[in-house]
Amino acid sequence: MDALEEESFALSFSSASDAEFDAVVGCLEDIIMDDEFQLLQRNFMDKYYQEFEDTEENKLTYTPIFNEYISLVEKYIEEQLLERIPGFNMAAFTTTLQHHKDEVAGDIFDMLLTFTDFLAFKEMFLDYRAEKEGRGLDLSSGLVVTSLCKSSSTPASQNNLRH
């Protein structure tokens, strides 16, 4: 069986709902990577990141920010998906997502999780605040540069070629 036959054979076993799910995830990746979405999310986070503190206690002020985020970002994504996939249903997709969560790229799933999981939402803001305040992950102290060339103990001026 050649590669084309194998691919065709595999496709015949995937259901229409799987293909639809894959199409939505592909569109989601495009939307999330788009400059317009990145700007929308960055502006929202710039507006509120200083409200969030890395403590166990969750302030009452977090709730309206969370609700505003859901309204703004989820609405934007849903509108974009409706433009690209006529008849798209966010509620149905969310249900399907729970069954396919292991198949979705981590960054997409994490972003979608910020709509329903408050702790994921708060963590996103804490990470953003740490980055803005220069407290991001610093790997420089763990890096060591080693020359792959063996250095000679003889200075270059004394290293004459002799015939």
Swiss-Prot record:
GO aspect biological process, one term: positive regulation of tyrosine phosphorylation of STAT protein
Gene Ontology molecular functions: GTPase regulator activity; transcription coactivator activity
GO CC, any one term: mitochondrial intermembrane space
Free-text tissue specificity from the UniProt record: Widely expressed, with most abundant activity in brain, especially in hippocampus and cortex. Also expressed in lung, cerebellum, liver, kidney, retina, spleen, muscle and heart (at protein level).
Subcellular location: Cytoplasm; Mitochondrion intermembrane space; Cytoplasm, Cytoskeleton, Microtubule organizing center, Centrosome; Nucleus
Transmembrane segments: none
Annotated InterPro entries: ARL2BP (IPR038849), BART_dom (IPR023379), BART_sf (IPR042541)
Key words of the record: Cell projection, Cilium, Cytoplasm, Cytoskeleton, Mitochondrion, Nucleus
Record family assignment: Belongs to the ARL2BP family.
Subunit structure and binding partners: Interacts with GTP bound ARL2 and ARL3; the complex ARL2-ARL2BP as well as ARL2BP alone, binds to SLC25A4/ANT1. Interaction with ARL2 may be required for targeting to cilia basal body. Interacts with STAT3; interaction is enhanced with ARL2. Found in a complex with ARL2BP, ARL2 and SLC25A6. Found in a complex with ARL2, ARL2BP and SLC25A4. Interacts with STAT2, STAT3 and STAT4.
Name of the protein this chain belongs to: ADP-ribosylation factor-like protein 2-binding protein
Organism listed in the record: Mus musculus
Gene for this chain: Arl2bp
